[in-house]
């Protein structure tokens, strides 16, 4: 069933999706990784926004983008070198939630809560404290 986001949400959705695609490019995410993180194929999301018709899953999509933005911002704060910041999600991580796997593996499970775990991990490590 399709429904439109509210005007405010719709105005936020397009720039949020653009920010997501820029981050995905910086992280060299594949189309499959982008879809897993976003919870839907990016091209479908773009088409829906262009048509002004969104489905009931859009609030979750915006929440996913919010977590990605937070993860990205935290990494930019932690690592002064852009390559280090962008590469962190692909490096094996001994932190408890990752079990030796890269953060990207957890981010790509398709579960909203796993994106939240990565964001909270960075916040909890004192790596980033949002203002």
Walk through the language-model features, giving the residues of each.
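Non-transmembrane "mature" sequence context
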Residues: 1-131
